[in-house]
């Protein structure tokens, strides 16, 4: 029988900001994989509210007591980052059918670029199916309550940045 090697997964994203949905996926990921690398995307077409350094720092604070989680950043193609990392799996979360089409296309393109890299999809916990960083930003900017929607370690920083007059 072939020896089973520890599998490291990369969980990529903009994380602007990190949500409880993201956190839930990473915590489920470390039950499935030996290690999860949270890879914060630097070059993105999204209009981010937090700099790359701030997003990396927030993720590091969230996972500082979780030795199976490493936080890193990358620019360029995700496949190139994964090829240079100890990982051989890309971990992605799916909230709804609408996520699947986009994620499926990306997984196929990544596989075309490097056939040795697999993409694994985890369904988002039902409590967080509606949640996205964009929704968090929209609710906060318009005075809505986001307590419990972002990890407590970054709540104050997110409020300070997003809520007018804070």
Curated annotation (Swiss-Prot):
Main localization, broad class: cytoplasm
Subcellular location as annotated: Cytoplasm
InterPro entries associated with the record: Cyt_trans-like, PPAT, Rossmann-like_a/b/a_fold
Cofactor: Mg(2+)
GO molecular function, one term: ATP binding
This protein's GO CC annotations: cytoplasm
Catalysis performed (reactions): (R)-4'-phosphopantetheine + ATP + H(+) = 3'-dephospho-CoA + diphosphate
Listed EC numbers: 2.7.7.3
Keyword Chloroplast: no
Family annotation (Gene3D superfamilies): HUPs
Site, as annotated: Transition state stabilizer: 22
Transmembrane segments: none
Swiss-Prot/TrEMBL keywords: ATP-binding, Coenzyme A biosynthesis, Cytoplasm, Magnesium, Nucleotide-binding, Nucleotidyltransferase, Transferase
GO biological process: coenzyme A biosynthetic process
Recorded superkingdom: Bacteria
Binding of substrate, residues: 14, 46, 78, 92
Signal peptide span: none
HAMAP family, A to Z: PPAT_bact
Role of this protein: Reversibly transfers an adenylyl group from ATP to 4'-phosphopantetheine, yielding dephospho-CoA (dPCoA) and pyrophosphate.
Family: Belongs to the bacterial CoaD family.
Assembly, per entry: Homohexamer.
Name this protein carries in UniProt: Phosphopantetheine adenylyltransferase
Species this protein is from: Maridesulfovibrio salexigens (strain ATCC 14822 / DSM 2638 / NCIMB 8403 / VKM B-1763)
Recorded name of the encoding gene: coaD
